[in-house]
Every structure is written in structure tokens, then in C-alpha cells.
Amino acid sequence: MYDRVRTSLFISPLLILAFISEIFLFLFLLSICILITYETNLNAKKYTRIYTYLLIIFTYFLLLSLNYNVLIYAVYISLLSFTVSIFFNILGLRKNKENLNFTNQISLDGKDVVNLFFLRETSTIYYLSGVLSIFFIYQSPSEINWVLLPLLTVFAIDSFSYIIGSRFGQRKLKLLEIISPNKTLIGYITAFLTGFIVFYILNYFFFNIFSPSTSLVISIAFPICAVFGDLYSSGIKRNFGLKDYGNILPGHGGVLDRLDSVIITLVLIGLAKVFLS
């Protein structure tokens, strides 16, 4: 718990600087993308793969600097790659569920190499494009609310579901136990209620981005997406026999362990902005 607090206190000033300075935002997101390409290697030493993705990322930033209209494509690519990767994620879990052992060591015997390859690459594209979609959501300082709303809501969801779930959660969902064995029913309920209430209140009283009717719809979809994003990442880690994506953030694990719910909700907000534009 204390590690989580210390990590949050360290990250908060970086986020503030990122939204004060465009250059720092660029460097901050570039650093996150580099860490994502490393973490999605998933224990494999594939440095050529990292260099390839870094080249793609730098090309995207170059196009942005040359004023090419590529902002919106990050949202579409993230949605498409996310949808495709779900198929490989579920396929891997179904085919190898007998090899998943959470009490001792997770076995990788009998894994489908082709399926794991496509799962790793499609999920990496989703993560990277999801992070880069922030450039579409946040194009000027006046649009800071578009970023603060999902970030604050996800923070509330993670905090309350973790506290309530760890203190009062006993009953687990057998359907999801193979993916996330430590999550409880009360934790999921808390996540949904927290996301619904916090999103609607923040939008209505502070940010005023969406109309009340639109906010109601997104308030329902938001916590569902946040929880699904967490389960999605957990499924990938189970497929590769990992507990965490990394250990760079004490108390959280890797960068993706902290951003799993954030990225999918950024895509949701990006889609909402597309349809409302």
C-alpha cells in the first residue's frame, strides 16, 4: 500500500508537467511508449522488435510535427487492434487453461506459438496507439478536461475497488478466476458504482464536456471498459505466464499494469469525441 502511495506521489508531478509543457508531454508519452515496447516483449529478448516499434513511433511523431492529420487514426487503430487481440487472448486462454496454475508456477507447456505471436503484436499496437490517441483528445490546453475526466475517474475506480475489495471481498467470480484470481465480486461492483458516480459528477459539476444524457451513457460504459481493460491485460499475462508486465513502478508492477484501465478509457473518450465532433 505504501509503495503504491509513493509511486503515485512520484508520478503526479510528472503528469502536471506534461500538461503544462507540450515538449514535456511529448517526452513523457515517448518515454511511456518506449517502456511499453520493452514490457510487451513479455520476457523474450527480441530487441529487433523494439527497434521496429520505436521507428514506427518516431515516424508518427514526425508526421505530427509536419502537421499531417494523423491524430484520429490512433483512435481507430487502437480500437481495431484491441478487437483483434481479444480473439487471440481468449483463444489462448481456452486452449491452455489446463496449464494455468496460480498456486505454484504458471506453466507455458503446450502454448500455441503462432497465437502468442499475434496476441503480443496486436496488443502492443493497441497499447501504443491507445497512448498516442491522447494527442487527438488533447490538442490544446483548453481541452485538458478531456484528459482529466478519464484519468481522475480511473484513479477513483482503482483506489476504491482495491480498498473495498481487499477489505470486504470474499466471494470470487469463478468465470473470471482463471484470468484474475484475486479479484472479488464486491471489488467489481465497487468499480462499476465508483466509475458511474465519479464520471457523472465530475462531468456535471466540474468539466461539463458532455450533455447530461450523453454523460449518463458514457458513465455506464466507462467503468465497464475500465474493468474489461484490466481483465484484458490480465488475460495476456496469463497467456505468457507472467504476474506483472514489469517492476518499474513499486506497488503496481510495470507501466502497463498501471495503464491497463487508462488506455481503454482514453480510446472510449476518443471515440466519444469523434462522434461529437
What is the meaning of each model-derived region?
Residues S81-F87, Y232-I236, L266-G270:
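A short, terminal or domain-edge coil/loop segment
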Residues M1-I220:
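Membrane-embedded alpha-helical bundles of polytopic integral membrane proteins
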Residues G270-S277:
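Juxtamembrane boundary at the C-terminal end of a transmembrane helix
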